Amino acid sequence: DTQAVYESIRNGDVTISHEVWQSTFGKSFYTAMAKGGIIDAGTHTAKTLEEVGVPQWVVDKNLCPGLPDYKALIKCASVFATPDSGGKGRILEGPQSWHGEEYPDRVEALLGDDWVVKFAGSADAIWADHASAKKEGRATLTFNWTPNFTDADGFVFIEWPPFYPGCRKQDGGDSKCGSPIGWLKKA
């Protein structure tokens, strides 16, 4: 719980948080700073991205020609079908509490009815899916983020239309956009 970490810093129980992600923790970070007792200790050189994509080997094996362009997914839905997707291409998102309807809205807007978003119970479920897909030689399309340990094995993020403020349905847009690139700070 990030907010608990910020409160612990403010109370002197924790000295530093080395990982404040703009997209998921930015608002609570600035709220904590406004209360006092916590500072912006600088920005890492690494940029952050929280997005769906494929393990590098899916691209290397050309399982869906044209990746990472999202338009390739329109023609490859069957390649990403799983037993629980009803014959549709499946995107394995993190737990629904992470992003709500953000990815289902985007999939509906850009990929249509041939795709379905399934929610994993945890990050570990996503990594287990990567491992089983690699062992079985099947394509998988999952949520991921960078920087992350998966960077070492290679992970290719889908290239959606660029993010702009207001593009998501919950912000009044049509959800025909990808995720923003963000900063990574220390508190």
Regions found by a protein language model. Give the residues of each.
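Extracytoplasmic small-molecule ligand-binding "clamshell" domains
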Residues: 1-17
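Loop/turn elements at helix/coil->beta-strand transitions in domains of secreted/extracellular proteins
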Residues: 13-15, 86-89, 111-115, 137-140
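Flexible, solvent-exposed loop/hinge segments that line or gate ligand/substrate-binding clefts
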Residues: 3-4, 22-42, 109-111, 118-187
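Structural recognition of the beta-strand scaffold that forms the well-ordered cores
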Residues: 15-19, 50-53, 90-94, 141-144
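A residue-level marker of the well-folded mature domains of exported/periplasmic proteins
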Residues: 59, 65-68, 83, 108-109, ...
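A conserved helix-loop-strand patch within extracytoplasmic ligand-binding domains
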Residues: 37-92
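Stable alpha-helical elements in mature extracytoplasmic
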Residues: 5, 66-69, 73, 99-103, ...
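Sec-exported extracytoplasmic/periplasmic mature domains
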Residues: 10-14, 75-78, 100, 108-112, ...
